[in-house]
């Protein structure tokens, strides 16, 4: 299985490294990093000052060379009526996206004594694993520690672990 990371807009090398390592570690897949892509034309919603997540997924699906593809951007994304999303994927699809925009808050809610850079890296890793999980057909999990649990805020992202719980792992394998 090949997962292609598609950087959309300017993205630090650290973000690409963390995403790649997490995907290889959890899914035991091959990972490539595509050349950087421009932000999709027409993706910006001026009334919200945010970008439409679906257009980033479409770009990752079209440009990516993997069986699964994940766009990663530093831009602020939204989907339908949600104020924002950390990421988005379609169940069993081949494209997905995460945004680092709202993952960069410095606090981890006092859960761990990690540096802001380490907290940010953990969040990137969890969100790419989560969104690629959806492309493999995994839905949201009720186990708050599972990487597939729904995370409306960074607090929930910080609570969950980077790995699939036993139930989700059995569904996948």
UniProtKB/Swiss-Prot annotation:
Annotated residues that bind Zn(2+) 2 are located at: 141, 146, 165, 168
Any GO BP annotation = proteolysis
> What keyword terms does UniProt attach to this protein?
Hydrolase, Metal-binding, Metalloprotease, Protease, Zinc
This protein's species is Haloquadratum walsbyi (strain DSM 16790 / HBSQ001)
* Subunit details: Monomer.
- Cite the cofactor comment: Binds 2 Zn(2+) ions per subunit. One is catalytic, whereas the other seems to have a structural role.
Q: What's one GO MF term for it? A: zinc ion binding
The UniProt record lists the EC number as 3.4.-.-
Q: Which cofactor does it need?
A: Zn(2+)
Q: Which domain of life is it from?
A: Archaea
The record's annotation in InterPro entries points to: MetalloPept_cat_dom_sf (IPR024079), Pept_M54_archaemetzincn (IPR012962), Pept_M54_archaemetzncn_arc/bac (IPR012091)
Q: What is this protein called?
A: Archaemetzincin
Q: What family does this chain come from, according to its entry?
A: Belongs to the peptidase M54 family.
Q: Top-level EC class, please?
A: hydrolase
* Physiological role: Probable zinc metalloprotease whose natural substrate is unknown.
Using the chain's own numbering, where are the disulfide bonds?
A: none
The residues that hold Zn(2+) 1 are 130, 134, 140
Q: Catalytic residues per the record? A: 131 (proton acceptor)
